[in-house]
Regions:
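DNA replication initiation on ssDNA origins
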Residues: 1-75, 83-88
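A short, contiguous, amphipathic alpha-helix enriched in charged residues
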Residues: 80-96
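Short, well-ordered alpha-helical packing segments
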Residues: 9, 91-95, 114
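Histidine-centered divalent-metal-coordination microenvironment in nucleic-acid enzymes
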Residues: 77-78, 100-114
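Catalytic micro-motifs at enzyme active sites that drive phosphoryl/nucleotidyl and oxygen chemistry
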Residues: 62-68, 91-92, 98-107
């Protein structure tokens, strides 16, 4: 797990003085489907290797601020919060347009496109 966490830390490097956390607080039925609710906040402390390991083990949810203090950015993410989400349509569009995106389901039921 340590080597995997180090790789994630390298690929998703970002702001070193702060990071986000997200906690699921419940879910609600909407006209468009089920949406999980949560609370996100920013902690003014570094994102450590131990926190990455906890995140990858599914114990906590973390968020990386991609923009660094030196105003560089190594990666980006599109957050799709459309409920109910049509993942087949999203995947078909990515393939049809040959977009260099990797889709990942989110804990709230949406999709992140990296």
């Amino acid at each position: 797990m340590e080597e995997t966490a180090k790789k994630f830390m390298d690929v998703f490097s970002g702001l070193e003085r702060a990071h986000g956390v997200y906690e699921i607080t419940g879910q609600k039925n909407t006209a468009k489907g089920i949406k999980r609710d949560g609370r996100g906040r920013t902690l003014q402390e570094p994102l450590t290797l131990d926190l990455w390991k906890q995140h990858l083990a599914g114990k906590i949810s973390i968020g990386v601020v991609p923009l660094k203090d030196d105003e560089t950015c190594k990666w980006g993410c599109i957050d799709v919060d459309e409920y109910p989400i049509n993942t087949e349509s999203i995947l078909a569009t990515i393939k049809e347009m040959s977009l260099p995106l990797v889709p990942c389901m989110t804990k709230s039921g949406g999709v992140h496109l990296f």
